[in-house]
A protein has these predicted regions:
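Bacterial N-terminal signal peptides that target proteins for export
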Residues: 2-9
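C-terminal motif of bacterial Sec signal peptides marking the signal peptidase cleavage site
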Residues: 16-19
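Bacterial lipoprotein signal-peptidase II cleavage site
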Residues: 21-27
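Conserved catalytic region of serine esterases and O-acyltransferases that act on ester linkages
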Residues: 22, 209-263
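N-terminal low-complexity, Pro/Thr/Ser-rich intrinsically disordered segments
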Residues: 27-41
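Conserved SGNH/GDSL esterase-like catalytic core that processes O-acyl groups on lipids
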Residues: 40-44, 49-124, 130
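Alpha-helical cap/lid subdomain in secreted, periplasmic
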Residues: 93-205, 214-215, 219-225
């Protein structure tokens, strides 16, 4: 009789534990499904500093790898300025009202050489974005050798100017240039530039994506994958970016350092 009672008791305990495990699994699945159903849209407006090495696609797949459903679109033209995009938007609408997040990338020389124009169009765009309850992010671009020579003769560098303009417009500054500066000082063996000493290398694009990921998601980029893939129009697998094994963790850590206090 006692043995029979023990068997019944063990059976009840087993069924209880099994049901608890299934409930937890179901809860986790439900949470993921809810997170995936709700998505937001992000528009990146700019030039080659935005589209080099598939930055928008890399960023979208970074979000997806963390179960953050943000779709990333771009309006980019090589060498373009924000004042040109302002005119393009007026004549060929960018549908900015459809986006929760909008990234503004002015020409790399404008913060130093044409700061009034840079300020004017950052303000125009930000006011327009605010009208539709969007959030503006200012792409804090880096200084390459030519710009470093110019900024050495001025009271502020590119990153400081763009940071100040962001604050004036209640926009969020994305410290990509600060991340570049940190790598150059502390990890000089990591190459951030193409052979023109201006445009970003694949390593630099990965770093840039990590900085954007942190600022937009509010989460640490440490622990993200080092490569991201998608599919082309024929449904075939393509890799958007593959970052070197020996440096991708360093780039994640740098992105964390420059964003942790401001994201």
């Amino acid at each position: 009789m006692e043995h029979r009672f023990n068997r019944i008791l063990y059976t009840i305990i087993f069924l209880f534990l099994f049901s608890c495990q299934n409930t937890k699994k179901a809860d986790r699945t439900d949470i993921k499904e809810v997170e995936k159903i709700t998505f937001k849209k992000m528009l990146m407006i700019g030039n080659s500093f935005t589209f080099y090495w598939n930055l928008p696609q890399v960023l979208e797949t970074m979000f997806d790898s963390s179960n953050i459903n943000i779709k990333v679109d771009q309006k980019t033209i090589g060498g373009s300025k924000l004042k040109e995009h302002w005119e393009y938007n007026k004549h060929k609408s960018y549908n900015i009202e459809d986006y929760e997040f909008v990234v503004l990338n002015d020409h790399s020389t404008y913060p130093l050489n044409n700061v009034d124009t840079c300020s004017k169009y950052l303000n125009l765009f930000t006011n327009y974005i605010n009208k539709y309850n969007g959030q503006t992010f200012v792409y804090g671009t880096w200084e390459y050798p030519y710009l470093k020579k110019i900024s050495s003769l001025k009271p502020s560098n590119t990153m400081q100017i763009l940071d100040s303009l962001s604050k004036l417009n209640n926009a969020k500054y994305v410290p990509v240039g600060n991340a570049f500066e940190y790598v150059e000082k502390n990890h000089p063996h990591i190459n951030l530039f193409m052979d023109d000493n201006k445009h970003p290398s694949p390593n630099a694009t990965y770093l840039t994506a990590c900085v954007f990921y942190s600022m937009i998601s509010g989460k640490s980029p440490v622990g993200l994958p080092r490569r991201f893939q998608g599919k082309n129009i024929d449904g075939k697998k393509i890799y958007y970016i593959i970052t070197e094994k020996n440096i991708y963790k360093t780039l994640q850590e740098v992105a964390e350092i420059v964003t942790i206090d401001i994201r």
